[in-house]
């Protein structure tokens, strides 16, 4: 069994046989677990510090709990308690074992004596209790001597944690002018100590900084205003420091602090005031409408919506000439021009401007009035203005037959300035590119300069300029619209070419065409045209004209029996007259074709040439024509054939063509890939060769006639005629001013190294080609293909080298 008393008392109380005893020793500062059993009591009663009654009351006994204080700072292990078995005779045969939470790490046990110690610093805030198991074993056999029993070690709290503000620092806002006691914000501090044990976690609040403006409730932590009429304009920001102290605020308690930043929000408690009671401004008389004259500003100590302003002109002689608007960003009043100004008409204006708050709080009306006024004096400054036309626009009507130089309008302008300078008039030629008009430079008389034609231009829009004589930069302008009135100067005419068709079987009185006319003149009351046959066709026996009295006319036949063979086309002149003054007329021609038609009146053919030949040809004439055509064709073919079979120029055989080339070898055995042929004709006529042929890349050097003999093959020495000829040509080339400045001479002093062919001198060892076979040249590869063809394939005489 587990107990905390002496063995005799434990046996008498519990009536048990063999048992295991618990001994516990507590620190002297706490309740001592004496040799008598400890009754189970509440912790706040056991450690509250209140006087305990000396009367003994009967309670239930708890034997399986130990108590130890946290934060032990001694150097020796902290003694917790003692385990003892009644089977332990003190000879060390019993071994005590401790297991469970913290066994061997936090708590240790002396396996011989059963003493339990704490070897680590304990913190109740980290762990409030530990549950362990104890067992007594036979040291020699390891057999359990007692059943395993469980017990608890509780950590008793001490005041080792100060209150903390987990949400600090705090930010709060309260309106200015708030009444005393207005709640601002609530702060909360927490204490990690055991709230059920003593006053370690009992927190009270106090204010360390921020008085006399604010106060704090000691229990709830609510911060309130403590001073009335706090003005934001005087002081806007406050820093309040709040302290939270445990142990109920008693001396020795731990404390924590936090900062509360409080801002006074604005209310509309300040009326606007103009810093100036009089403003003076100036504006040019030429300032356009809506241009800015100046600004006024009413100062308001409030901010935001409470500082919004509204400016109005409440009085003065300039209310109709000027306007004022409020700038929403800067809350200033902007005075602008409302209508055009004139220095000559009025030189100054006076305005009375009011600035007011549109948002007023009723509880602060006693601080008003919330508007203010100021006086603005505006002076109009004179400028040199351009001439002004009266009227501002001209509309002129003129007939198109007006004579050149006729005055159609007097344009008038004047200088609005007091100096009244002289004016010169002109026309903006960009508005009158045809130069139909001109204006008198001094009088402003607008006159015609060219004949007018309404049918060409019925409207003219010109711009007349007026310039001051003393200041040509001052130019005024006015628009003049000129309408050209119509006169009857155009005769009516057909709008298009009329062509009518009449059938051969047409009857008399049949309608063959309806015609109309157009007139370019402008009709005032509607044009009316009259149609009739022209005088030269008044007695036309074939056709007649009937006026429809609606500006159209019908063309009718007078007879029947029209025949294409007799006359296929008729031309009918028609006279068209208008109703203008004077009467104008013109003659239009109607073309009428006679056509073959079907019985139902559909036109079949209007071309008489389709039915007969204009000239009868005999069969003999046709045969003669065909014969001439055949002869011409044969001649053409003969000429073409002769041109194609023209004798071709003589082409020199390829084998003989080798005599026309000089072959240059950079090394022996190079074959045709190392050759560069030169046209022999260029040697005979170097001027033409230079003009016609593209220049060739060559290796230039000064001509050395005297050294030529050392490079000439031996065969050349035998033929002295050829040698002399070459020297003569070389000298001629050197002396020719048109020849290239250098001749290309190559030196062949060494035979090529590594050539599969031996010396070429073997080619000259025989007296004739028949004495030696040159078939081996074909085995030397493509580089010697040309040489193999020269010596192996040719059957003619050997070339002369």
Curated annotation (Swiss-Prot):
GO terms for biological process: adherens junction organization; calcium-dependent cell-cell adhesion via plasma membrane cell adhesion molecules; cell migration; cell morphogenesis; cell-cell adhesion mediated by cadherin; cell-cell junction assembly; homophilic cell adhesion via plasma membrane adhesion molecules. Residues 60-619 are extracellular. Residues 641-801 are cytoplasmic. The chain crosses the membrane at residues 620-640. It is found in: Cell membrane. Glycans are attached at residues 261, 420, 461, 542. This is Cadherin-20. The lineage of its organism: Eukaryota, Metazoa, Chordata, Craniata, Vertebrata. The gene is Cdh20.
């Amino acid at each position: 069994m587990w107990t905390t008393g002496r063995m005799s008392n434990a046996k008498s109380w519990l009536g048990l046989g063999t048992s295991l005893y618990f001994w516990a020793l507590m620190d002297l500062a706490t309740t001592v677990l004496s040799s008598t059993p400890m009754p189970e009591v509440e912790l706040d009663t056991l450690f509250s510090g209140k006087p305990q009654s000396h009367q003994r009351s009967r309670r239930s006994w708890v034997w399986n709990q130990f108590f130890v204080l946290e934060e032990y700072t001694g150097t020796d292990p902290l003694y917790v308690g003692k385990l003892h078995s009644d089977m332990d005779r003190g000879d060390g045969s019993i071994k005590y074992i401790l297991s469970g939470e913290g066994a061997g790490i936090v708590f240790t046990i002396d396996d011989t004596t059963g003493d339990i110690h704490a070897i680590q610093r304990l913190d109740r805030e980290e762990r409030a209790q530990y549950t362990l198991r104890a067992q007594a074993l036979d040291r020699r056999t390891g057999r359990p001597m007692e059943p395993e029993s469980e017990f608890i070690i509780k950590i008793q709290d001490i005041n080792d944690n100060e209150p903390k503000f987990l949400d600090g620092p705090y930010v709060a806002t309260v309106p200015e002018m708030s009444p005393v006691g207005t709640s601002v914000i609530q702060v909360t501090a927490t204490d990690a100590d055991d709230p059920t044990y003593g006053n370690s976690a009992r927190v009270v609040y106090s204010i360390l900084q921020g008085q006399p403006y604010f106060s704090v409730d000691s229990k709830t932590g609510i911060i309130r205003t403590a001073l009335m009429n706090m003005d934001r304009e005087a002081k806007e920001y406050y820093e309040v420091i709040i302290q939270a102290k445990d142990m109920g605020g008693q001396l020795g308690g731990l404390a924590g602090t936090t900062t509360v930043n409080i801002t006074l929000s604005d209310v509309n408690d300040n009326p606007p005031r103009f810093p100036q009671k009089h403003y003076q401004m100036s504006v040019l008389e030429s300032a356009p409408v809506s241009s800015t004259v100046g600004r006024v500003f009413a100062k308001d100590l409030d901010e935001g919506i409470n500082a919004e302003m509204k400016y109005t002109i409440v009085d003065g002689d300039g209310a109709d000439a000027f306007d004022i608007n409020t700038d929403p960003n800067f809350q200033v009043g902007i005075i602008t021009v409302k209508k055009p100004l004139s220095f000559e008409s009025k030189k100054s204006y006076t305005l009375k401007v009011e600035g007011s708050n549109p948002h007023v709080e009723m509880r602060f009306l006693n601080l008003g009035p919330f508007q203010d006024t100021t006086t603005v004096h505006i002076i109009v400054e004179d400028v040199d203005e351009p001439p002004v036309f009266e009227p501002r626009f001209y509309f002129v009507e003129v007939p198109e037959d007006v004579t050149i130089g006729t005055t159609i309008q007097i344009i008038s302008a004047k200088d609005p300035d007091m100096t009244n300078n002289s004016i010169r008039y002109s026309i903006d030629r960009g508005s009158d590119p045809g130069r139909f008009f001109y204006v008198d430079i001094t009088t402003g008389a607008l006159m015609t300069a060219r004949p007018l034609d309404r049918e060409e231009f019925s409207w003219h829009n010109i711009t007349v300029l007026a310039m001051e004589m003393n200041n040509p930069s001052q130019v005024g302008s006015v628009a003049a619209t000129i309408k050209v009135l119509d006169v009857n100067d155009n005769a009516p005419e057909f709008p298009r070419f009329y062509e009518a068709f009449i059938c051969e079987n047409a009857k008399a009185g049949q309608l063959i065409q309806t015609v109309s006319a157009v007139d370019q003149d402008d009709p005032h009351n509607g044009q009316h045209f009259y149609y009739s046959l022209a005088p030269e066709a008044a007695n036309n026996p074939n056709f007649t004209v009937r006026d429809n009295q609606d500006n159209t006319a019908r063309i009718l036949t007078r007879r029947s029996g029209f025949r294409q063979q007799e006359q296929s086309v008729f031309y009918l002149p028609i006279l068209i007259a208008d109703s203008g003054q004077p009467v104008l007329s013109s003659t239009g021609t109607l073309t009428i074709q006679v056509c073959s038609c079907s019985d139902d009146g559909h036109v079949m053919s209007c071309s008489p040439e389709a039915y007969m030949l204009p000239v009868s040809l005999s069969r003999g004439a046709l045969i003669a024509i065909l014969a001439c055509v055949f002869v011409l064709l044969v001649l053409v073919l003969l000429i073409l054939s002769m041109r194609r079979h023209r004798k071709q120029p003589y082409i020199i055989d390829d084998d003989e063509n080798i005599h026309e080339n000089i072959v240059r070898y950079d090394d022996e055995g190079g074959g045709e890939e190392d050759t560069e042929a030169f046209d022999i004709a260029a040697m005979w006529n170097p001027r033409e060769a230079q003009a016609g042929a593209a220049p060739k890349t060559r290796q230039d050097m000064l001509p050395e006639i005297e050294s030529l003999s050392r490079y000439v093959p031996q065969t050349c020495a035998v033929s002295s005629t050829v040698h002399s000829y070459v020297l003569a040509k070389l000298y001629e080339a050197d002396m020719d001013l048109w020849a290239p400045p250098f001749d290309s001479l190559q030196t062949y002093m060494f035979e090529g190294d590594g050539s599969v062919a031996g010396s070429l001198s073997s080619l000259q060892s025989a007296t004739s080609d028949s004495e030696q076979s040159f078939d081996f040249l074909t085995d030397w590869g493509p580089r010697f293909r040309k040489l193999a063809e020269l010596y192996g394939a040719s059957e003619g005489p050997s070339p002369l080298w």
